[in-house]
Amino acid sequence: MNKYISVIVAGALAGMSASAQAEINLTAETASPGSTPGISVLALSEAAANANVANIQVTPGQTLTNSVQNVAEGKTDIAAAPFILPFLMSKAVGPYAKLGKEKGAELASQVAALYTYRISVQGLYAFDSSNIDGWNGIAGARIFNGPPRGAALTNARLLIKLNTGLEEGKGYTGVQVNWGQAVKTIQDGSADAFVLPMSFPDGRVTAALASGDMTIWSLPKSVYDSDAFAKVGKLPGTVPTELKIADMGYTSGVTVVSEDDTFRGPGTVGGEVVNVNMDFDVAKALTKAFIDGLDNVYRAKAPFMSNAWHGETDIALTDMCGNNPIKYHPGAVAAWEEAGYTIPDCAK
């Protein structure tokens, strides 16, 4: 797959016609290559090449806050996007506050989805050798909670406040590094615990097991069922998620703590996004390549990809519509419907 990874070159070619698909070069940005969005975008590059649709040059290890803005501005053709980001952009809040409301709304309107998936489920974990005994152990601790800016950091701060009432800088010390340094930071003692996006099984967790056994804590059921968490679940790109511990994919070295046999947490949903001005036929062909490659490309890439909700169009899992400003690209809609899927009118 390395042949699909290269430094982004200038000149997004999203406006080229489908008649020259075999010659199209597209650029894409995504998160770390071992994450769900990282593997998903790399899988798209493979599926598109297999179908002779396009050559997609992928730059992994990016902060997706920047990547989504690059797509909106036409600087990049494709990006992995947690759906909270276009929402924050549309309101010019959080990492997009400097854009201003008018500019933020304008940029957010330039982004459309090809397909969706569950990026991760946010949770707390720590080495068994640490002094962390669960969510109540966060007070006064150093918590690695994501890159310096982006959806992961925003969600982690929100989740910690929901569980403990603590804010970064007052109740605990936040540690932020880019995704490329994540495993090193988990292993080197820079933080006491980690509130990060997880897949099941999670690549960062399994890689860090070389430094010792770990424990993952579910959200307490009382918090998961609370009105406060229900409000979190209404944020665009957030889907309350329950998963049987037995289905999380861990064997030795990892203990999952819950009141029952179920892990609970906020699922982060997003998808691959493009500029709304991408050529209809190109967007359609890319989406068709995705659909055709679901089993032999996407779900075959990593153990956790089979439960990441690729190929779903039910808004209960995609979190399209409602407060989510993102719609499917018209070309993507055509590909989905030709493949026999139903796309809700509110997502078109």
Predicted regions and their residues:
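Pocket-lining segment of extracytoplasmic ligand-binding domains
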Residues: 83-85, 92-94, 100-103, 130, ...
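An extracytoplasmic/periplasmic, membrane-proximal ligand-sensing/linker region
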Residues: 40, 198-212, 216-224, 228-231, ...
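Gram-negative bacterial Sec-dependent N-terminal signal peptides
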Residues: 1-21
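N-terminal segment of the mature folded domain
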Residues: 72-116
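Ligand-binding clefts/hinges and TM-proximal coupling segments of bilobed small-molecule sensing domains
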Residues: 139-145, 149-158, 236-285, 289-312
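Extracytoplasmic
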Residues: 23, 53, 63-66, 73, ...
